[in-house]
Amino acid sequence: MIERGKFRSLTLINWNGFFARTFDLDELVTTLSGGNGAGKSTTMAAFVTALIPDLTLLHFRNTTEAGATSGSRDKGLHGKLKAGVCYSMLDTINSRHQRVVVGVRLQQVAGRDRKVDIKPFAIQGLPMSVQPTQLVTETLNERQARVLPLNELKDKLEAMEGVQFKQFNSITDYHSLMFDLGIIARRLRSASDRSKFYRLIEASLYGGISSAITRSLRDYLLPENSGVRKAFQDMEAALRENRMTLEAIRVTQSDRDLFKHLISEATNYVAADYMRHANERRVHLDKALEFRRELHTSRQQLAAEQYKHVDMARELAEHNGAEGDLEADYQAASDHLNLVQTALRQQEKIERYEADLDELQIRLEEQNEVVAEAIERQEENEARAEAAELEVDELKSQLADYQQALDVQQTRAIQYNQAIAALNRAKELCHLPDLTADSAAEWLETFQAKELEATEKMLSLEQKMSMAQTAHSQFEQAYQLVVAINGPLARNEAWDVARELLREGVDQRHLAEQVQPLRMRLSELEQRLREQQEAERLLADFCKRQGKNFDIDELEALHQELEARIASLSDSVSNAREERMALRQEQEQLQSRIQSLMQRAPVWLAAQNSLNQLSEQCGEEFSSSQDVTEYLQQLLEREREAIVERDEVGARKNAVDEEIERLSQPGGSEDQRLNALAERFGGVLLSEIYDDVSLEDAPYFSALYGPSRHAIVVPDLSQVTEHLEGLTDCPEDLYLIEGDPQSFDDSVFSVDELEKAVVVKIADRQWRYSRFPEVPLFGRAARESRIESLHAEREVLSERFATLSFDVQKTQRLHQAFSRFIGSHLAVAFESDPEAEIRQLNSRRVELERALSNHENDNQQQRIQFEQAKEGVTALNRILPRLNLLADDSLADRVDEIRERLDEAQEAARFVQQFGNQLAKLEPIVSVLQSDPEQFEQLKEDYAYSQQMQRDARQQAFALTEVVQRRAHFSYSDSAEMLSGNSDLNEKLRERLEQAEAERTRAREALRGHAVQLNQYNQVLASLKSSYDTKKELLNDLQRELQDIGVRADSGAEERARIRRDELHAQLSNNRSRRNQLEKALTFCEAEMDNLTRKLRKLERDYFEMREQVVTAKAGWCAVMRMVKDNGVERRLHRRELAYLSADDLRSMSDKALGALRLAVADNEHLRDVLRMSEDPKRPERKIQFFVAVYQHLRERIRQDIIRTDDPVEAIEQMEIELSRLTEELTSREQKLAISSRSVANIIRKTIQREQNRIRMLNQGLQNVSFGQVNSVRLNVNVRETHAMLLDVLSEQHEQHQDLFNSNRLTFSEALAKLYQRLNPQIDMGQRTPQTIGEELLDYRNYLEMEVEVNRGSDGWLRAESGALSTGEAIGTGMSILVMVVQSWEDESRRLRGKDISPCRLLFLDEAARLDARSIATLFELCERLQMQLIIAAPENISPEKGTTYKLVRKVFQNTEHVHVVGLRGFAPQLPETLPGSDEAPSQAS
């Protein structure tokens, strides 16, 4: 027997009050005992959290005992955790004796919403010796331990051999593993399944009858029969598809003749017009080529006559172009002269402003020094006046208030101390430890002399600094000039670079003076170069016309040769009349042969089209008529073989269909009569009892029962006897077995199991030996497996049958096509190709035409050579006078050399213009660059040191001065003497006040006078700065304007510009004079050419009209060809046999087809409109659009699920083959797919009966359950009256409602819904569709009503409701219901799980004190009988003698809260035993 899985322990890590606690769980009942707040609910919450880690469901309410003095510390999940990492782990062992630890890592998330982060995990392969607390904690010392985070736990487990650690990202994966390993009873695939499981656990935890469960008992107890629903849905989908296909076939059959007629007439209509246009295009193209040849010849003649005119026009154009260039050059020279004059004026202004700026710069520097000195003196006067003002104010305030004077006298005692401090400071600064107030005056003179000496030294260095600074400024000025000219450079290179720049400046000035002579020389050479280039152009033009290059020395000889050639050509005469006549005679013979071949070509093309179609259909190539006849014999043999194979496959397919239908019967009955007999006898088919047997056990039970596997199990055989009399409608052998269908087992036989066989001892003298069948059919799983394999085989057979049927009909049609070909085209199909011979003859005709054309061209070429020779002589007459210029090869080099020298001179002039002023300034001061005053820095350091020494001496003198000034303060040693001399004090204050006021007056006068002087200095400085800035800005504007002008303003620029302007004016006058002469000559030449032009104008007009016509036709034909190729209809329209018909015949053919098409498309608005538009003869592409529209229309009408091709012509050919076969096959398939209403009712009834039997089996387990006055609990299952009526009508009266089930417009679900509405018109269906209602009616659970009933005291059986029961009774009843649900889940999930696993069973019960001792004992008995574990909680020990009891006490020690746990196992059968580890106190992590 398979052992049931158990929960071994629960481990809490870092929970509120539990740092590291493991609760060993009893195999039956584990009791948590303790007062309010002890941690019972926290422990159960940890268990539930590890079981269902879904934050959307978890909600732990306060369920502690009412009236307790201490309130509950539970605040949901967040309040039950402590800060840091927390764990809740369940240690389990399943039926395979595998240890599995599942749990969750919890951690509080910071924030006001009090969230908790949960990570589920599982550990497999853990040794039994390892405790859960050892895994997740690390001992630091004897009193401290640390909780490991999840990543460290993972690393720790991975280091252990054979241990597997899995972390889950989804709760579904976590529960899937728990289900597969037998930890939970049901596979939780969705959030809805998890919600049901949590509601069950929650109902168990809080006790009582859960309304959430009792209201939806059907969802909890009755499994969903999804297989039946899916079978109905697949059946309806298949029927719908089948009917749609049949309808498409019927539509296609009705349209088949229309398709043929439409395609045939549309092809004749469009192809005739297409080929007519193709023929006309070829004729027009030939005419256009002939016109082009004639026009080309005429243009050549006209070109020869116009040569003179072109030559003169070219020369005139050259002079016109030269005149424009000369005018532009002349205008540019005038503008340049104006710019040079403007630039010279600007340069004079710039020089004046630069001189003014230099003078202002010197004055500005001097004024800055004056202002700085005046500011220093002003600051000293302000300080002296402020000190005098403060002293006067102080003395006046002392005299105004006598009491204040007394305070001052008291203050002088403080001044005495300050005098002593001043004396000490003077000793320190002056390094005089023996200094006294009396000797301070002597030392003061000494240090004042030292200060004077330091001041004189500083002034001397300051004077040296000024001198050095002057030299430094000159060096900087020269250095900056060098940088401005040369660019950035090192200071030590300034002297060498400056000398180089001065030497370069001299050279540049020398070069700048050569600009004008070089420019005049360049102008002269350029004029000669232009004449030379003109002569070279004439020579190049002559060589180009002659097609050969000539040297200068050869020109005179060539002139004589051309004159001799002209004489010879004028005397030669060509006579080729006889040759021309022979060529024309041969051309006429070829034309006659071509005409005869064109008459034979259409017949041959028709035969070839038929032959090509046969080759494409059969995939063979035929080279003779004998090949055709031999292949026809092979075709007949192949047809016979395909028919035989098709019949064999069809027979096997029918056999498979019959077997599938037989195995698909509900209840496993292969004979429908057995179902009726079972209902009649009040029994159950043996196959239904064993319907749930697994696929592995099916061979055994099939062999065990042998022929009696289709027996009927009846409660009493004696009651069946009377039914057997006269029984005829039954199988040949009917087996009856007596037994209880609800508790039937296989103990009716004595069986010995052998290897793949059994021996059944039916009686003492009768044994039966049965081997295990290779293909078992006993049980639903075995039948479904066999049906699945049969379906796969049927699909293969159906596909093979369809292929063979298509091949047979295709072969038959191919045979007919061969027969037609032999009768019509075999005589001419294998003759030679007439079109190939026509092409050869056309090639010869073209050669003859070319020969005639060459004969004419030879004569024409001789005339052209004569004209060319005359033109050559004329050109040489113009070239020979300029031979001397052509021989001068160095002229261009000399021009380039002079131009380069001129560029250098102009660049030098630009350098002088740009840097001349800087070089002039640099030349007088360049000597200062020889030595860089580097000692200027050392001088600055010495000056700074002397300033520091002077400041030190001044401080020492000031310190001694302060001592000397405070000598009077040394006499204030006695305060009483100071107070007694009040009158003397008053007099002294007045004297001092007069002195202070006099000093203040002097300071004010000095300050006022110096302020006026400083203001004058600042005004002068501001005036200088303003003048300097204004002139600087004007100078910059002038320089920018000069740069914008872009002209060098040197001394000779104006003269050069004026000379250049006069030269260009003279050249322009000469060119205008020559142009006038050429215009007069050209006018005379054009008058002579007009006569020749009129002769050719008519020919040109005719040619262009024909060319325009050809181009227009070509554009339209290109659009037609593009449309034909894009739509793939060229093969249909380009019918080569039509090319040999005349235009009238083709037009007549197209008109006849048009009349037929008008009748054919009269009912189709779209095609009618397109046909009407295609009748326009000027728009041939519209006929193609009509043909494409016809093809598109036919493609849309042909269903791709019937005919898989895009070509309507091919589709029509395949259609005739497929339609009859598909119609027959689909009709039979619809009959097989349809299911009768009686079968539906039987399926639903059998399912309801099976589930009622299962509920009765569950009720048997609760018969002896009693809680208080409740003596028993049961589930009552009834069929709803309205649904029972529906089942009766479906099985008995379905003939009356065949209008619903035989309708093609309604699916079976919709027909079932309509029937339900017809039977129950009083029920409001709301907004639900008939399809939705029908699908609900196919679910057997909607036919049942379930409720929980209890047998309570004298009331008998009544509905279980919380209001009618006491608290303890409600808890016990609810627990019974939950046990029933868990057991039902296990039965439902048995197929999905391994057969060797029995899942864990565990429920909760909080606050179990509400149950009495008898109810507690009942719970214990129920747990023992059902092998179920139970965790209960109560304030006191309920039954310590049974199960395992934990006593929980919450304590506070040193501000640390923990729960003290003591565990006891049941002591009824043995002495009490303290559980291991119950005394250890929890440690807190430091």
Swiss-Prot record:
This is Chromosome partition protein MukB. ATP binds at G34, G35, N36, G37, A38, G39, K40, S41. The hinge domain, which separates the large intramolecular coiled coil regions, allows the homodimerization, forming a V-shaped homodimer. InterPro entries: MukB (IPR012090), MukB/SMC (IPR050308), MukB_hinge (IPR032520), MukB_hinge_sf (IPR042501), MukB_N_dom (IPR007406), P-loop_NTPase (IPR027417). PANTHER family: CHROMOSOME PARTITION PROTEIN MUKB (PTHR42963), DUF4476 DOMAIN-CONTAINING PROTEIN (PTHR42963:SF1). It comes from Escherichia coli O81 (strain ED1a). It is found in: Cytoplasm, Nucleoid. Residues 326-418, 444-480, 509-603, 835-923, 977-1115, 1209-1266 form a coiled coil. The keyword DNA-binding applies. It comes from the Bacteria. It holds the Pfam family SbcC_Walker_B. Residues 666-783 are annotated as: Flexible hinge. Keywords: ATP-binding, Cell cycle, Cell division, Chromosome partition, Coiled coil, Cytoplasm, DNA condensation, DNA-binding, Nucleotide-binding. Homodimerization via its hinge domain. Binds to DNA via its C-terminal region. Interacts, and probably forms a ternary complex, with MukE and MukF via its C-terminal region. The complex formation is stimulated by calcium or magnesium. Interacts with tubulin-related protein FtsZ. Belongs to the SMC family. MukB subfamily. Plays a central role in chromosome condensation, segregation and cell cycle progression. Functions as a homodimer, which is essential for chromosome partition. Involved in negative DNA supercoiling in vivo, and by this means organize and compact chromosomes. May achieve or facilitate chromosome segregation by condensation DNA from both sides of a centrally located replisome during cell division. The keyword ATP-binding applies. One of its GO terms (biological process) is chromosome segregation. GO terms for molecular function: ATP binding; DNA binding. GO terms for cellular component: cytoplasm; nucleoid.
